[in-house]
């Protein structure tokens, strides 16, 4: 900000030397020797500085007080003063006015005991360190209006400078409240500290700002590692406070400065003036960390509490109010690790902080990208000091440095919502801001909650981050790349933009331990932009290591990728931020998807785990790439990257990659995390990877088993998507066992739909049966994005990677499958068998809410006893329509290959509802497996597989028309496959064999009677649908068959059959008619329904049809519209196209296109093109595209290949009349090409004009534009015979249209032009054309004659 803008009270004197106190207060240093400021700075000002001079601050405060809120630093030491503003007064600062007088008043009011202030814990004698929250003016207003004064007081804290001891506090300085819309163009804050000078300013709108542009962040790195001398400068003596508030207009160099300020020794105040969101910066000196500590906390645990401005402030009060404690550091008084405190000698300095979430793209994600930012070295001494008793809150200026500032800017309303979410916590748990953790914390954010409860006092509690933006406002997280790199000694490294130790007694004192943590939270104006939390607490090497990192990215309307890399250079027990928890760690509840890599090796091994959360809204795709590598370990653990893809109605999309590695001895102790509340499971798409070390027997990470205690040590990851009954179809799980040793894997997935939680497998069943046995099981389903409430399908990958074993398949059972049983309860068990077996087989399909027309509507959402069959693959037969059967035979051959065989009983239309599938595989015999399933007829099909490669099916009356085979490793994408039998090698069962010629229909009677049209036709003699002939050819084909086309009688299903059995007529029924038809089909018996309309053929259900209509309204992609038109019968399509759409699923296909990056890019391009093309603003997307192609074609070089390509495309587009009106506007250009182009160019132009001449209206336009003369010129030029023939065809079309006598009668608007058309020249031209035609014919005959 320029000096001019700075108000008198806010201006800092540039002339002050670095040695002086804060520039604002420097000049009045002699004048205000005693400046009293409450330890808790309740400056509620929304970012406006008092217009009064610093000296004019609320009055001199005793030297003992921290600092004057007015912006003047007092030289006094920071000591806790029981002064706090009254709850009501604290809040009432007028955002725009905030004068020194009011501050002084507030200061007086603050004389009230600290207990009154929500920031000060009543119990703690020492006042928690003052936090300076810079709240936007508007937010303050909002808060004052909407938030109880008590609650909002914390939010309104003006960035006030820390106590003298804290020496220079970096504080964001804003000259005056700035309206939300106004960017802080002029305000830049540069904090000149010695070497560590960092300045940060955030222009919300300004990309140049350091934090906003991600690129700029590089130099800044939020965590700038500072040399010890820098640290000293930071912990500079209070006399030397060099707190420069340099007001300058936004300059790049300043932007490059680090975005945070830290008090050298004292709590650093960070008030960021981020304008748009409430920006709460909170600083905590390590002793004062507990400023946020809940007032109700007896122990005065030092817990950092962050609260966000706006509603957040109240959030703090609210959650705490509930508990009676603002933010309670749940840890006992004895355990006094300051959450954020970093103790350190003067030389040691922790720099931490960071962030602004500027705009959606925000800097923080950007800054995160830089590796250096977060690094900060912290000596062990500091770590120990962290754990110092809270009672010793007296400032240790030299030793301690403020370590991080946590800044969250959010919009007021988003904060409020977030806070309300917080309130979901259990009564006894305090919620602090969006972020908090507490020892017995049971609270979970309604959107996201992580509960960490230490089992014992000595255990530290993992940090808990609650923050979900506005439920829907939070979209995809901005791209954040965070890399934590220890920069200090190997043994002592603190990495993290934000670090805290929850439990005081967390043995941070161990010398070899380092704590890394980074927490980033950024929020955009309208929604949380992103949040990253990294919390590490590390007990001594002897104790369990706990690392927590939580990454959360949420961004408004932007697709972002989050990538976190955590690498540990320290060979000692270093823990990396990405979040994870150690074995002994109390179970943590994660409300969100984690991508976790756990490596619990020797105690000195670092545990690296990234946890990313991508929260996506409104069909935003968030891709999370989590990579963690430890350098002391030979093999880096890379957690799988997953992208969360979300459909518009999906609330969240999240991906989960989970990779646990545990020591053999601790494998069973693996921590289990779950979130209790179903609402906490927004994941829609997960990918789970479980890697076991050579020695570990079991790994037991459970993700989100909300109802189930973590009673088992069985490796299991629970994945399910439960968000509003919407499940992403991308769910997938992959489990890799690099070791041959026996492990127990149990991956459970269940959908959390509505209020019910479905447990796919029984936990008890997944117990290891023998030491040598390996049980691998995971349930997965890929549900179509958000279409069906529960997970409908299971796509499961269990990959076993021993050298001798190979598993292939999107779905398959692990290396030694002894048996798989399909039980209606939805449980199955796989018992390991031969090690060397190779099980190959895959089957994949996507499900729709209602799959299949007729009997096959499958909705795996509802899990009634009679419906859901969970087996190696899950088919839930929906209500009346029972799935005929799912059969899986996993048969290891002698050489170790098991081939799954799926048998689907015959025609669905005649399927009996009584089918139960049993799949048995006996690896011991290796010789045969019997698969039984209820066939559509009374008879049963018995499939015997001799050594897995022999399959014969026998049916009575050939119930299965044709077998469908696929290899085990091949995926089939049919939603509801037709009768299927998979045989390994038997040629006689192969679909390649032609049907017996004797079975071919010999007449139309046989065809129409024996093969009634049905909703599906597959192998064997195809049903009638595959044969589609034009109406004009029907009689011709009838004569060829020796009969007349036979009409099909109207069936009892109230649906008339098509006139010609081989004819496909698109149905142009209205939406209302289609709805009625689909309802009638659902109400009818599936066996009796027979209809070959396009909706029935594509198996579109009522719900799917409604969703299709919504997608057409919300999307403008021309390709998606074409697919929708085909599905609605408005466009004809080839059989291949219809089969493809049916097999893929209409909604699944459209959703895939909507989420496919190139599709989105194309759609964006076309939308931009429309905006940039005012000449045709009323055209739809495809018409706009046609216009663009025409214009580009004329711009290309004459006769060039690009021009020919454009002409060819336009010719194809004009085969239908839809785009004639668009193309005809460019006739002049086409005539030019007709005269100037070569023979090939003229050929393509003439073909285009031939298409136009087939339309009456276009024929009229051709005549008006005098196209006849152009054609005659070509006659005279003696063009090629091909071109002459096309011209003659055009004349023939024109002649036919003229004879219809409707040519000039249709359009009354152009009567004048009609009158202008003179038919005499046309008649002469036609006669001349006729002469040319005769001559051409004669020439052709001469060539043919010998």
From Swiss-Prot:
Modified residues (Phosphothreonine): 860
Disulfide bonds, paired cysteine numbers: none
One Pfam family from the record: Arm_2
Main location: cytoplasm
GO biological process: endosome to lysosome transport; G protein-coupled receptor catabolic process
Biased composition regions of type Basic and acidic residues, renumbered to the chain: 347-361, 370-399, 990-1003
Modified residues (Phosphoserine): 295, 619, 626, 862
Localization (cell): Cytoplasm
Protein name in the entry: G-protein coupled receptor-associated sorting protein 1
């Amino acid at each position: 900000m320029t000096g001019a803008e700075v108000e008198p009270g806010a201006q800092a004197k540039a002339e002050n030397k670095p040695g002086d106190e804060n520039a604002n207060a420097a000049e009045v240093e002699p004048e205000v020797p005693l400046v009293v400021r409450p330890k808790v700075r309740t400056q509620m000002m929304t970012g406006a500085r008092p217009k009064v001079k610093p000296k004019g601050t609320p009055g001199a405060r005793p030297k003992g007080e921290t600092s004057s809120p007015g912006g003047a630093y007092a030289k006094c030491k920071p000591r806790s003063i029981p002064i706090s503003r009254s709850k009501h007064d604290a809040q009432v600062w007028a955002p725009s006015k905030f004068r020194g007088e009011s501050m002084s008043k507030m200061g007086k009011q603050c004389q009230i005991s600290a207990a009154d202030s929500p920031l000060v814990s009543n119990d703690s004698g020492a006042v928690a360190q003052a936090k300076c929250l810079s709240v936007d003016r508007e937010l303050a207003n909002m808060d004052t209006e909407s938030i109880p004064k008590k609650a909002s007081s914390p939010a309104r804290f003006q960035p006030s400078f820390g106590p003298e001891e804290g020496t220079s506090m970096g504080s964001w300085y804003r000259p005056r409240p700035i309206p939300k819309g106004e960017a802080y163009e002029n305000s830049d804050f540069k904090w000149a500290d010695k070497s560590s000078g960092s300045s940060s300013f955030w222009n919300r709108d300004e990309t140049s700002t350091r934090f906003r542009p991600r690129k700029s962040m590089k130099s800044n790195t939020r965590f700038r590692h500072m040399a010890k001398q820098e640290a000293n400068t930071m912990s500079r003596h209070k006399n030397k406070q060099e707190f420069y508030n340099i007001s300058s207009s936004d300059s790049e160099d300043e932007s490059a400065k680090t975005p945070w300020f830290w008090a050298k020794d004292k709590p650093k105040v960070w008030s960021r003036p981020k304008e748009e969101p409430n920006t709460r910066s909170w600083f905590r000196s390590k002793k004062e960390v507990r400023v946020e500590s809940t007032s109700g906390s007896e122990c005065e645990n030092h817990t950092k509490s962050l609260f966000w401005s706006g509603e957040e402030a109240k959030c703090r009060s609210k959650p705490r109010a509930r508990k009676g404690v603002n933010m309670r550091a749940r840890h006992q008084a004895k355990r006094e690790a300051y959450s954020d405190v970093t103790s350190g000698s003067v030389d040691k300095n922790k720099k931490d902080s960071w962030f602004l979430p500027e705009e959606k793209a925000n800097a923080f994600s950007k800054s995160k990208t830089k590796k250096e930012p977060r690094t900060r070295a912290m000596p062990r001494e500091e770590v120990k000091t962290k754990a110092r008793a809270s009672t010793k809150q007296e400032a240790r200026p030299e030793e301690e440095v403020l370590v991080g500032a946590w800044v969250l800017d959010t919009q007021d309303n988003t904060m409020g919502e977030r806070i309300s979410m917080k309130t979901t916590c259990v009564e006894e748990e305090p919620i602090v801001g969006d972020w908090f953790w507490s020892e017995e914390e049971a609270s979970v954010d309604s959107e996201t909650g992580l509960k960490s409860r230490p089992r014992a006092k000595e255990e530290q509690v993992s940090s808990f981050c609650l923050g979900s933006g506005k439920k829907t406002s939070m979209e995809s997280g901005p791209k954040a790349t965070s890399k934590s790199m220890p920069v200090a000694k190997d043994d002592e490294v603190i990495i993290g933009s934000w670090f805290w130790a929850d439990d005081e007694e967390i043995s941070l004192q161990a010398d070899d331990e380092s704590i890394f943590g980074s927490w980033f939270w950024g929020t955009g104006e309208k929604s949380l932009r992103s949040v990253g939390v990294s919390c590490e607490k590390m007990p001594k090497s002897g104790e369990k290591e706990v690392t927590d990192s939580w990454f959360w990215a949420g961004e408004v309307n932007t697709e972002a990728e989050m990538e976190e890399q955590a690498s540990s250079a320290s060979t000692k027990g270093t823990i990396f931020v990405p979040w994870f928890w150690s074995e002994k760690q109390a179970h943590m509840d994660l409300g969100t998807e984690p991508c976790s890599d756990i490596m619990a090796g020797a105690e000195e091994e670092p545990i690296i785990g990234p946890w990313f959360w991508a929260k996506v809204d409104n069909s935003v795709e968030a891709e999370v790439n989590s990579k963690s590598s430890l350098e002391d370990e030979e093999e880096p653990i890379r957690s799988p990257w997953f992208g969360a893809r979300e459909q518009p109605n999906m609330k969240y999309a999240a991906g989960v990659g989970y990779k646990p590695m545990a020591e053999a001895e601790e494998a069973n102790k693996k921590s289990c995390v779950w979130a209790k509340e179903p609402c906490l499971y927004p994941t829609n798409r997960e990918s789970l990877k479980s890697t076991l070390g050579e020695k570990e027997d079991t790994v037991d990470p459970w993700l989100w088993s909300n109802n189930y205690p973590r009673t088992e040590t069985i490796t299991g990851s629970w994945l399910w998507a439960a968000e509003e009954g919407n499940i992403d179809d991308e769910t997938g799980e992959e489990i890799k066992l690099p070791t041959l040793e026996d492990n127990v894997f149990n991956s459970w997935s269940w959908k959390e739909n509505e209020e019910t939680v479905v447990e796919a497998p029984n936990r008890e069943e997944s117990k290891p049966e023998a030491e040598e046995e390996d049980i691998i099981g995971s349930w997965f389903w890929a549900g179509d994005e958000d279409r069906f409430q529960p997970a409908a399908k299971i796509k499961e990958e269990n990959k076993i990677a021993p050298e001798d074993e190979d598993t292939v398949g999107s779905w398959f059972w692990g290396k030694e499958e002894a048996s798989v049983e399909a039980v209606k309860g939805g449980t199955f068990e796989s018992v390991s068998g031969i090690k060397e077996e190779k099980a190959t087989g895959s089957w994949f399909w996507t499900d729709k809410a209602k799959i299949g027309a007729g009997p096959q509507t499958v909705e795996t959402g509802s899990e009634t006893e009679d419906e859901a069959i969970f087996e190696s693959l899950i088919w839930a037969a929906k209500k009346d329509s029972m799935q005929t059967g799912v059969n899986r035979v996993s048969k290891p051959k002698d050489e170790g290959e098991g081939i799954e065989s799926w048998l689907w009983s015959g025609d669905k239309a005649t399927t009996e509802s009584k089918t139960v599938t049993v799949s048995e595989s006996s690896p011991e015999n290796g010789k045969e497996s019997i698969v039984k399933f209820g066939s559509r007829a009374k008879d049963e099909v018995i499939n015997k597989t001799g050594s897995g490669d022999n399959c014969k099916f026998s049916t009575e009356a050939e119930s299965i028309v044709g077998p469908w085979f696929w290899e085990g490793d091949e995926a089939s994408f049919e939603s509801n496959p037709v009768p299927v039998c998979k045989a390994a090698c038997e040629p006689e069962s192969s679909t390649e064999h032609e049907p017996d010629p004797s079975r071919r229909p010999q007449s139309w009677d046989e065809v129409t009677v024996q093969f009634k049209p049905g909703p599906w036709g597959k192998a064997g003699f195809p049903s009638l649908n595959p044969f589609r002939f034009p109406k004009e050819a029907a009689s011709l084909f009838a004569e060829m068959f020796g009969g007349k086309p036979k009409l099909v009688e109207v069936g009892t299903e109230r649906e008339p059959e098509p006139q010609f059995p081989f004819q496909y007529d698109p149905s142009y029924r209205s939406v209302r008619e289609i709805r009625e038809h689909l309802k009638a089909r659902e109400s009818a018996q599936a066996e009796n329904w027979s209809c070959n309309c396009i909706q029935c053929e594509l198996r579109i259900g009522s719900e799917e049809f409604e969703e299709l209509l919504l997608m057409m309204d919300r999307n403008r992609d021309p390709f998606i519209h074409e697919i929708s038109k085909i599905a609605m019968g408005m466009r004809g399509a080839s059989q291949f196209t219809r089969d493809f759409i049916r097999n893929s699923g209409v909604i699944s296909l459209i959703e895939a296109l909507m989420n496919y990056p190139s599709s989105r890019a194309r759609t964006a391009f076309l939308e931009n093109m429309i905006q940039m093309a005012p000449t045709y603003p009323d055209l739809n997307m495809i018409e706009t595209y046609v216009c663009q192609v025409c214009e580009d074609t004329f711009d290309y070089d004459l006769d060039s290949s690009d021009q020919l390509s454009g002409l060819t495309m336009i010719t194809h587009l004009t085969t239908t009349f839809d785009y004639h009106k668009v193309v005809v506007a460019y006739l002049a250009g086409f005539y030019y090409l007709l005269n100037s182009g070569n023979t090939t160019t003229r050929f393509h132009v003439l073909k285009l004009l031939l298409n136009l001449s087939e339309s009456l209206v276009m024929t009229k336009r051709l005549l008006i534009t005098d196209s006849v003369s152009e054609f005659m010129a070509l006659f005279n030029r003696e063009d090629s015979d091909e071109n002459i023939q096309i011209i003659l065809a055009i004349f023939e079309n024109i002649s036919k249209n003229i004879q219809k006598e409707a040519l000039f009668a249709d359009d009354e608007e152009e009567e004048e032009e009609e009158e202008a058309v003179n038919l005499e020249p046309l008649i002469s031209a036609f006669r001349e054309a006729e002469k040319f035609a005769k001559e051409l014919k004669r020439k052709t005959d001469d060539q043919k004659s010998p």
